[in-house]
């Protein structure tokens, strides 16, 4: 079983709201490259419920016990935003612009929330850097 932690720092790279991709939260939990950047942005950030589910699933995949997953997820200082019709529509429409980069529904859900809230999408996925979208993307790795 892997160990993981939550590290939160309070320095922001922007005054705009940060929207966390699942890859960023997983990287922070397991102290992967770029975890410090994520930890600095995590407090008060937003996360789509779709991405929240992805993080839980990744922890399950790594063999973390359910009770530990529930405990660590409850400690996250993030606002989990339910997916609504507007976000779902944006995520669906993003398919054409993101297909070549291989973005998943979860990835597009993060971007849709960032677009909807005029925020900054924070990810570990370098493929996002090549996207030409009307949203700011911060690749932490």
Name these PLM-found stretches.
Residues 35, 52, 66, 88-91:
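A general structural signal for well-ordered alpha-helical segments in protein cores
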Residues 1-47, 59-71:
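Short, well-structured N-terminal submotif of metal-dependent ribonuclease cores
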Residues 2-7, 81-122:
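Active-site neighborhoods of divalent-metal-dependent phosphate/nucleic-acid chemistry enzymes
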Residues 18, 44-47, 76-80, 120:
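Short loop->beta-strand "edge-of-pocket" segments that line small-molecule binding or catalytic clefts
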Residues 1-13, 17, 111, 115-141:
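Acidic, PIN/NYN-like endoribonuclease modules and their adjacent C-terminal/linker elements
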Residues 20-21, 47-48, 103-105, 125-126, ...:
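Histidine- and aromatic-rich ligand-binding microenvironments
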Residues 24-25, 51, 87, 109-110, ...:
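Alpha-helix capping/helix-boundary segments
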């Amino acid at each position: 079983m892997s160990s993981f932690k939550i590290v939160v720092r309070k320095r922001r790279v922007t005054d705009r709201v940060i929207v966390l991709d699942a890859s960023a939260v997983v990287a922070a939990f397991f102290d992967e490259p770029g975890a410090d950047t994520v930890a600095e942005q995590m407090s008060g950030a937003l996360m789509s419920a779709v991405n929240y589910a992805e993080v839980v699933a990744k922890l399950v995949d790594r063999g973390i016990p359910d009770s530990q997953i529930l405990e660590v997820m409850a400690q996250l200082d993030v606002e989990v935003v339910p997916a609504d019709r507007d976000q779902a529509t944006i995520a669906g429409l993003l398919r054409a612009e993101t297909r070549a980069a291989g973005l998943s529904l979860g990835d597009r859900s993060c971007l849709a929330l960032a677009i909807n809230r005029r925020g900054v999408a924070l990810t570990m996925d370098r493929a996002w850097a090549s996207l030409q979208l009307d949203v700011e993307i911060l690749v932490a790795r």
